[in-house]
From Swiss-Prot:
Disulfide bonds: none annotated. It comes from Arabidopsis thaliana. It comes from the Eukaryota. LRR repeats lie at residues 86-113, 138-163, 185-210, 264-293, 294-319. This is F-box/LRR-repeat protein At3g59250. Residues 6-54 form the F-box domain.
Amino acid sequence: MDIGPKDKISNLPEALICHILSFLPIEDSALTSVLSKRWRYLFAFRPNLVFDDSVCLRPPCGHGVIPDYVTSWILNVLERGVLDLDLQVNVNGVRLPSKVFVSKSLVRLRIESGNVRGIDVDDVFLPKLKSLYLHTIMLGKGEDCFEKLTSGCHVLEELVLNNVYSNVWNRSVSSKTLKRLTLWCTESYDKNPHSVLFDTPNLVYLKYSDYVAAKYPKVNFSSLVDATIGLAMTSDQDANASYDALVGNATDFLMGICNVQILCLSANSLAVLTFCCESIPVFNNLIQLTIKTNQSVGWESLPALLKNCPILETLVFEGLLHMYTIKCGDVDGCLCKYSGEVPSCLSSSPVKVLKILRFGEYGIVNQIEMIKIFLETMPHLEQLTVYYNTPIGGDLIEEVSSQLKNFAREASPNCEIQVIPDVLS
């Protein structure tokens, strides 16, 4: 009777062996090629291949890889019907081929680089692509680069463009299939785009950061539910900002997102509402609002914004910081108590849940006073949670909690108050 060891794995079907190899690091699965003639090329047929030059080049090549080789590798996998392509390119001299946007098989495409790489957007034909992620990429010289990207992706559902630019300062995203969109442009360029157009009627999630455009010819977000907005003024606009005249106009864009249910605004967006908006639209569907704050931006637009959220349930402040301005003395020009009167946006507020994140940054005296105003004036408040930016277990948490609970809560006597470490937020 044969009781010696048996190679049961080699008797498995090749498809199953390739599937098993797909769970190993590429360098380990490649080592199986020495087992026998049958195993020699099996690792190359695994459904996922990861090429990392820091692993494959031993000793590391001091001058990197030859740019032409990178192009041929990319074209090779595209011709072989790859479904998921993830390119992280940090090779000097590489200009990615425009054919990276031509594939009948691709379902997911991700291109990321350590610095701006150029891709000429000639023809885009990605009929099966559902997810497209581009990071730090310079698109070609045409005026319709952004439009070409979406028009050539017939079933695209998710589009992420982080620091993606073209030589023409226009941005246009038009797609009936798109559900999630991230358009995040760095502030290092300090320039207003000429035109930004959104025609995405089925979009439900938007993350958008940019300088205020000269115009928004079309903003179609009829299905939008959740939006994170980081609009900003350029340094020139900021220097010329005045209460007497607008230095830009983001009104059309803001009108386009007024049907959202969940909204997060950067501190700079508050400044845009103040100096680049004819009037703040009414957010009739908004139930959760998050406001990010810093010491260089005032709250002049906040009272009008809160007034125009008639069914708001949850209000979140990331910090209670703001720049003190002449409007702080106006009852409807800020939320602080320098006017000596209660802002009507608080006394009529429908908010039930109030959350304060990053509490304690840059001192707590003024922030405690601000929370006291909330407790005294917001009539429907049921829950206040303060996330204290202090080490866990510190006595300060108990002290602040006790102080807040001792405040007179005339407007919301049954409000539950919690103070917890910010690390839990």
